[in-house]
């Protein structure tokens, strides 16, 4: 029985609730418990059997499958490092004393089951995959992949001085591997397997039994435990059904847990080795919820408010109260810096990554500020002397905490200060030279209007009480200790922060020289308050205004498939907004009540990290109901449909209140503009595929009438304000949506609309210095637009734009590259025809290399059939290639053709073009425009063709027949005509044998010279004499 089947066959119902224990680890006086919910709890087990919950770690969203503890020492800090692994492959490294998540690592290969410490430098991860990942402990990075396993590997403890590492497998075999630790390479030395009964099942674990005898180990099968010596010699066995785990006690007693019982066995050596049953305890023992604690077997059960420790051999039950876990702290203040979100709660402060939160719905904190206690009322990061970033946190009780930012999203605690003011609502940092020697000043403003000043050495300088008036403005002078304080009752005070004196001040012109405004907080100005993202807490909703430029710069859309397209279908099937069918009252699936369409708002990012929908009176999380609904899907959906909401009559105020994401440079009238056009222009095909799938499925859910209204709305923007193409971002956004809808649903448009739109974009691409945006818009729906414009003009503009942006031709995420790819996918034959005819003839010779580069990209992305494509090559492209043979880009074109169509090739001088046509080899002599066909048919399917450098020999490989065929090109002299004619004959056939008949065999000609070639098919490498 394998681990997956064992997990699914467990009878206990606690697993389904996510509360049950999924892994346990003991280290010194600590007991670390991982749960199916992903939570990790750390208990301090004292000598009097008293359990104390000292820490909880929350980062995993899947069952914690394995835990390892290591001593940690760095920068004078001595701590315990706890490394946790969940089934999804997420690795987290925690520091116990500081509660810091020091590092994370994500594996994506299968179900990860076990974390194993190989030595002081390396950890190993095994699971339901045929490899072992090696992770260097010092930098927490994958440094090697141990392959060569034919079954799921099982690692178990071995002697440190051993030169060979044993690895067990489910069939009972054990391989001994030698390791070169410098090169991190592995070599299998020997394989052993004990002769055991096949009824025992499969091996699920190996437990060393050195306390019983040297070189002994218990092999845990699904239905028996077997004691082996040296992993090979059978000693004794004991049969039990549905075994889940086995532990060996210090006295040599084996404790065996099954799904329904716990059994204690003792091994006796005489008269012959056998196991003796000592005792048996019945009961449901959850999978992996049992361990050996203080040399005694114990089972753990977790409930919402407590965890129980059942001592099986003693019959006693201890418990530990978990009330601290059920106290959910409310968010009292939110603050952002770049893509980090700081949430001040009623019990402390934590920092999250907006990048992870927004894109992955992963609310795991990056850092916890454990020194901060009490209700956080204000915080801010300041740049002080020597460019140090200092985070200042204030609480309701009047305490201030100072942290310095370190590398790797870490913070160093500096100090804590008790202020004379309470309920701090504002902190200001003034850079000025004081007579005390400090170069800066922190000013804390209280709810009652009082002020407190500290210098940059965190010394309390002065306190200024208030009679209830609120501060409106502070005026600071660089070289004086005085600060002018202006109140809302028109009072002005001159406050000397060093001498702790205060006098009445007078307004004068000098006051205007420098000031810091701390006036009323203006919500409408939120995106411009800070350089980056910012956050606001209103009505228990954390509103995050995200700088989309920073977000996209931190993405790598080409390599990260973080959204499956099936998720889009599930998400759209779940959330169909009622405003799309405004004439029909719909009962909302979340709240179960009928509501007015104008009350719908979008929210992303509650304090718990869930995406939400917000209404005028209530908000509801949809993550639990729709598990594949991510914040990114929510945002993409509403970015497409928000203009329709506006068209339906939603007011600016209500809609702006519900939209959480804005660009920092947008005006209030541009609230409906999304990040869509920016992401589309700065992302690869993965992200663009997500957007297209999202829009395609959205259009399927919209009735024809609603779609017409949507198209009409976007046309309204673009036709009425088309002259302000570069002044209004909303026009660009409308054009992006229209061009995408054209590519997905052209039948929804009138012919007049398509003509107008395509002509408009073509004119913009010409008049705006071959504008990339207009070119990108035309490429979105090229298959449709090309019917209403002269495609040669557009392609001419495309080439001129390529000339201006040659570097973009090598950037797969650039606007230009994506435009060429989309046009190629849509109609590569038309693109190449235009390039070879109209465009190539109009260009000067120094521009033809750019055209050839575009040609190679078009060929690489074509989806045309070879028969149609081959006619274009012979009639249009070959003369151009032959005349430009000295240009380097010609070889890019020939390589692209050979890559896209492996059964076609060129010689090194680009004088002969060859291809396979229904078993016949055809050689086209480019200069003479003459076609030569082989005299004999190959009578097999040739997948790969390659020519010798001179074009005299051709090698073809057939994977189906496992055969290699060699043709010779020669000139036959005819005497009575006194001339020579070319001929193609099969010189030899070579049968290639592979080691395995069922392996996937993809043929390949690795290299070819004038006299020989190397062919690879399946597991065979053959060097052939031509």
Curated annotation (Swiss-Prot):
Keywords: Cytoplasm, Nucleus, Repeat, WD repeat. WD repeats lie at residues 14-53, 62-104, 148-187, 937-977. GO terms for cellular component: cytoplasmic microtubule; cytosol; kinetochore; microtubule associated complex; nuclear envelope; nucleus. GO terms for biological process: establishment of mitotic spindle orientation; microtubule organizing center organization; nuclear migration; vesicle transport along microtubule. It is found in: Cytoplasm; Nucleus. Its main location: cytoplasm. One of its GO terms (molecular function) is microtubule plus-end binding. Signal peptide: none annotated. The keyword Transcription regulation does not apply. This is Uncharacterized WD repeat-containing protein C16H5.13. It comes from Schizosaccharomyces pombe (strain 972 / ATCC 24843).
């Amino acid at each position: 029985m394998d681990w997956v089947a064992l997990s699914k066959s467990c009878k206990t119902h606690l697993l389904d609730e996510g509360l049950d224990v999924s892994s346990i680890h003991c280290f010194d006086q600590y007991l670390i418990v991982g749960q199916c919910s992903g939570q990790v709890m750390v208990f301090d087990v004292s000598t009097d059997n008293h359990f104390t919950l000292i820490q909880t770690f929350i980062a995993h969203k899947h069952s914690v499958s394995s835990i390892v503890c290591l001593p940690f020492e760095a920068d004078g800090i001595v701590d315990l490092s706890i490394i946790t692994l969940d089934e999804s492959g997420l690795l987290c490294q925690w520091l116990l004393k500081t509660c810091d998540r020091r590092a994370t690592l994500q594996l994506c290969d299968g179900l990860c089951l076990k974390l194993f410490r190989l030595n002081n430098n390396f950890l190993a991860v095994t699971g339901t995959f045929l490899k072992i990942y090696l992770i260097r402990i010092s930098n927490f990075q994958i440094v090697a992949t141990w392959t060569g396993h034919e079954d799921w590997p099982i690692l178990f403890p071995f002697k440190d001085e051993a030169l060979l590492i044993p690895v067990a497998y489910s069939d009972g075999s054990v391989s001994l591997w030698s390791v070169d630790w410098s090169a991190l390479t592995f070599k299998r030395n020997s394989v052993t397997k004990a002769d055991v009964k096949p009824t025992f099942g499969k091996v699920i674990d190996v437990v060393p039994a050195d306390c019983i005898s040297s070189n002994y180990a218990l092999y845990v099968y699904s239905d028996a435990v077997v004691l082996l010596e040296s992993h090979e010699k059978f000693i004794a066995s004991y049969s039990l059904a549905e075994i889940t785990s086995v532990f060996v006690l210090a006295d040599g007693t084996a404790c065996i847990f099954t799904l329904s019982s716990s059994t204690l066995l003792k091994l006796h050596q005489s008269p012959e080795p056998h196991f003796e049953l000592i005792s048996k305890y019945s009961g449901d023992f959850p999978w992996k919820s049992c361990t050996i604690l203080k040399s005694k077997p114990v089972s753990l059960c977790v409930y919402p408010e407590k965890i129980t420790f059942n001592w099986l051999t003693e019959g006693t039950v201890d418990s530990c109260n978990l009330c601290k876990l059920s106290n959910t702290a409310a968010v009292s203040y939110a603050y952002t810096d770049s893509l980090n979100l700081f949430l001040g709660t009623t019990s402390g402060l934590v920092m999250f990554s907006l990048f992870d939160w927004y894109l992955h719905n992963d609310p795991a904190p990056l850092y916890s500020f454990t020194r901060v206690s009490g209700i956080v009322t204000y915080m801010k990061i300041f740049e002080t002397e020597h460019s140090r970033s200092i985070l200042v946190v204030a609480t309701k009780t009047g305490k201030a905490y100072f942290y310095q930012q370190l590398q790797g999203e870490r913070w160093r605690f500096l100090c804590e200060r008790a202020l004379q003011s309470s309920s701090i609502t504002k902190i200001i940092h003034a850079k000025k030279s004081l007579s005390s020697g400090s170069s800066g000043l922190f000013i804390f403003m209280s709810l009652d209007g009082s002020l407190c000043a500290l210098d940059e050495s965190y010394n309390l300088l002065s306190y200024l009480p208030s009679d209830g008036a609120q501060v409106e403005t502070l005026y600071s002078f660089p070289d004086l200790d005085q600060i002018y304080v202006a109140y809302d009752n028109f009072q002005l005070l001159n406050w000397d922060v060093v001498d702790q004196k205060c006098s009445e001040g007078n307004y004068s012109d000098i006051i205007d020289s420098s000031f810091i405004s701390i006036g009323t907080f203006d919500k409408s100005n939120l995106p411009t308050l800070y350089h980056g993202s910012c956050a606001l807490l209103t009505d228990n909703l954390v509103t995050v205004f995200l700088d989309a430029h920073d977000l996209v710069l931190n993405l790598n859309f080409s390599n990260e498939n973080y959204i499956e397209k099936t998720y889009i279908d599930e998400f759209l099937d779940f959330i169909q907004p009622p405003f799309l069918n405004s004439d029909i009252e719909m009962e909302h699936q979340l709240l179960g009540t009928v509501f007015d369409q104008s009350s719908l708002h979008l929210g992303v990012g509650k304090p718990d990290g869930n995406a939400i929908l917000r209404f005028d009176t209530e908000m509801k999380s949809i993550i639990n109901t729709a598990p594949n609904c991510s914040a990114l899907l929510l945002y993409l959906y509403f970015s497409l449909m928000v203009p329709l909401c506006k068209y339906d009559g939603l007011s600016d105020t209500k809609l702006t209140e519900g939209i959480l994401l804005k660009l920092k440079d947008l005006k209030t009238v541009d609230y409906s503009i999304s990040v869509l056009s920016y992401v589309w222009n700065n992302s690869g095909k993965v992200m663009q595929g997500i957007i297209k799938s999202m829009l395609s499925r959205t259009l399927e859910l919209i009735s024809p009438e609603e779609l017409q209204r949507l198209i009409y709305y976007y046309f309204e923007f673009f036709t009425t304000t088309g002259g302000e193409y570069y002044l209004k971002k909303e026009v660009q956004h409308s054009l992006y949506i229209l061009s995408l809808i054209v590519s997905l649903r052209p039948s929804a448009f009138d012919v007049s609309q398509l003509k107008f739109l395509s002509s408009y974009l073509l004119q913009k691409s010409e008049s705006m210095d071959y504008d990339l945006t207009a070119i990108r818009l035309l490429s979105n729906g090229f298959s449709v637009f090309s019917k209403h414009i002269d495609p040669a003009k557009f392609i001419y503009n495309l080439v001129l734009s390529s000339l201006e942006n040659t570097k973009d031709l090598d950037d797969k995420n650039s606007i230009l590259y994506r435009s060429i790819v989309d046009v190629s996918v849509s109609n590569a034959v038309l693109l190449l025809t235009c390039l070879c005819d109209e465009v190539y003839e109009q260009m000067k010779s120094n521009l033809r290399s750019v055209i050839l580069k575009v040609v190679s990209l078009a060929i690489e992305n074509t989806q045309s059939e070879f028969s149609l494509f081959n006619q274009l090559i012979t009639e249009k492209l070959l003369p151009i290639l032959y005349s430009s043979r000295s240009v380097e880009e010609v070889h890019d074109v020939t390589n692209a053709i050979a890559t896209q169509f492996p059964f076609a090739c060129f010689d090194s001088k680009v004088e002969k073009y060859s291809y396979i046509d229904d078993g016949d080899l055809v050689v086209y002599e480019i200069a003479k425009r003459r076609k030569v066909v082989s005299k004999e048919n190959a009578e097999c399917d040739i997948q790969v063709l390659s020519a010798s450098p001179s074009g005299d020999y051709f090698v073809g490989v057939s994977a189906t027949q496992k055969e290699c065929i060699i043709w010779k090109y020669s000139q036959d002299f005819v005497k009575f005509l006194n001339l020579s004619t070319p001929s193609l004959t099969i010189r030899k056939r070579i049968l290639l044998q592979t080691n395995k008949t069922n392996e996937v065999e993809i043929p390949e000609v690795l290299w070819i010279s004038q006299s020989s070639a190397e062919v690879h098919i399946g597991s065979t490498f053959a060097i052939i004499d031509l």
